[in-house]
Structure formats: C-alpha cells, structure tokens
C-alpha cells in the first residue's frame, strides 16, 4: 500500500533510519516524515488489451470499406472505440494488431458509444485522421441513426433543440443539442425512429428520447422506472448511415441492422423499408 511505498522510498523513517514494514515501533521511537503528502493520489491506468486472432478476424469481417486512407466497419454493440480505465476490449487495440494496419496505426476520428452498433470510421494515416476529425468537428459529416423506443411520439417528424447538462468534475456544463427526427413506423408499444444529430453531444440521442418520455429499448442508463423489462440486453440504437465529401469524393456508407435489432422489430410489429 501507500505506507509500504513511503517506507521503501525513505519518506517515512524511524529514528532517522530507513526501516522495513515488518519492524515494530517501540516506546520513545521517533517517526520521521520527509516530503510526505498526506493526500493519496489515485492514478488510473489505461488498460491494455491484447486481442486474440479470433477477435481480430471477427472485427475484420465487419469491414464495409478498406481504402488507402481509412477503413469503415459495422461496429458491434458492446465494444469500445478506444481503451480506457474502465473498458478493456476496444477497436484501436484490436486493429493495431491487424495486418490491415501493418506499418501504420489506427486513428479513431469520431465517437460511437460502446453499446451503439453501426458505421464507424478509423483513419490509417495522421493526415487522413486530421482531415476526417475536422469534417466531424465542422459538422460536414451527415449521420443517420435508427432507434427502437418505447411508446409513441406525439409528432411524426420534427426537431429537438435541448440544453443538455454534463459535469466536468464538479463543474456543471450546459451544451446545446440539436437533432432532426422522423417516425418510420409505430404502434402503442414501440416506435422505429430515424435520427439525424446536427450536434454531437455525449449520449445526445439517448438523453433526448428519454426527455420526451420515449427511452430507447435496452438503455439501462436513460430509462423510465417501468420501461426496462429485460426484453433485450442490447441497446436498440444503430448508426445506420454516414455521408461526407473528402478530397472532392462523395462517400456514403450504410451498416446493416444487427440480428437482435431485426428480431425486436419483428416482435414489436414494426416495419423497416431499407
């Protein structure tokens, strides 16, 4: 522990002598503290993920396009884009070991929640990463999501303009969030909704659907008390299509719906005409 560490480094001494933690303190012993910080600092280390050949292959099989500048894949639900202190399995570490990125490394150029499936782009070079990142930041990338949510929306189409709250430590931050929506099919139990986020706030679509009382199926974070009945473990939010222009070339990428998404559409008697 921390005391053990300070004993080894000599920040804690007995009678001005370095001692081991096994030594017992006697009466009249003097405990010395040198450059001692009584505040324990917790350092969170990023977890390194070592993917198996099977995991690498299964993710390579999800690739929609592979060109000299970037790859596009249909990301599975339950896998993070980048590693972190909480997440282990992630796309950056997986593709770093792939032959596709031999001689280079994968660059993550945009966000996609761990539990959200669908279109995701990874750059192959620093130059491509800078270009694509700037396109996302300048809102030049047009994104379309599909979601299955509880109940019916009052209007079949429209836009949401919300002030979303997030916290940076104890600091409260309010961010403007704008999304265009269109109901593709609905009944009293569920709705299939097309979502086009104009801004890119964290958990934007999930928060906005929760705010109108129609949370997404499978969302355990933004849910009404009676809305989550364990029908499906997966979050029913899918990044369906991405469109952008890069170097005067138009790019459009569409990701097929996961089987569990199609299964819930059928269960809820919702139709999707792709």
Write out the residue ranges for each language-model feature.
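RNA pseudouridine synthases
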Residues: 1-274
